[in-house]
Amino acid sequence: LDEYKLYPAGDCAINVTFSNRVDPQINRSIQQLQENLRSMQQTGITGFVPAFRTLTVFYDPILVTFEQLERAIHQASLKASTLQTQAIRIVHIPVCYGKDFGPDLKNVANHAKLTPREVVKRHYQPNYLIYMLGFLPGFVYLGGLDPQLATPRLATPRLKIEPGAVGIAGEQTGIYPIESPGGWQIIGQTPLRLFQPDQDEPFYYHAGDYIHFDPVSDFEYQQIKKMVDEGHYQVYIETRKVTEDGDSSDTAGITDDGSGSGKN
């Protein structure tokens, strides 16, 4: 694993802090440490929150002390990596770009000095690594946006952004899972319900997964939305192998094993 430092976060959490940069290798170290700690079944650990460069480990101080958890984290960091050949998931998100679904697509195109069609193509081509979830339930912070598409936030945020809105802000792209105010440049919309609190698994994805945006027409959007409303739509989740040199911007280091799954 990459080098890290430990910081107390109150009396029932530890922040495991890696290098001060956003990097796929750091993300793999975070995912590996979390997996190692889970497999150790350390008494007293109550949960994990992975982020860009930290893993917050929550614990019950009655069951385990800070010092004991420090030792457990150190032990977990020494375990051999299992992520080099681990299967990773690519969750396919259908998106209708532009028009009423993407009111800021022209803004992004003008800023990038591209046509709207070129913006759309550059946006849906990569596989985006999910570094973390935050801000809203199921809001994904993604790595891998084409640098030319980086666009500042709106000068005046909107008071209401619809669930499923796909946007760009600075060097990041993401999806609003629920209605919210926000200042991201909205370029498209997915008909999927990304936050399903009534389900055992409320999200289709987790930190460490990838997202791929699949462009769809207005007609396809409405058809998918109808199936989602009726509970018939299956989200396509692709399974691939990731190697040590895998990154977040494309399929380098990811080998296709031809498998996939669906989820309502």
Report the location of each language-model feature.
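Glycine-rich active-site loops that engage anionic ligands at enzyme catalytic sites
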Residues: 1-264
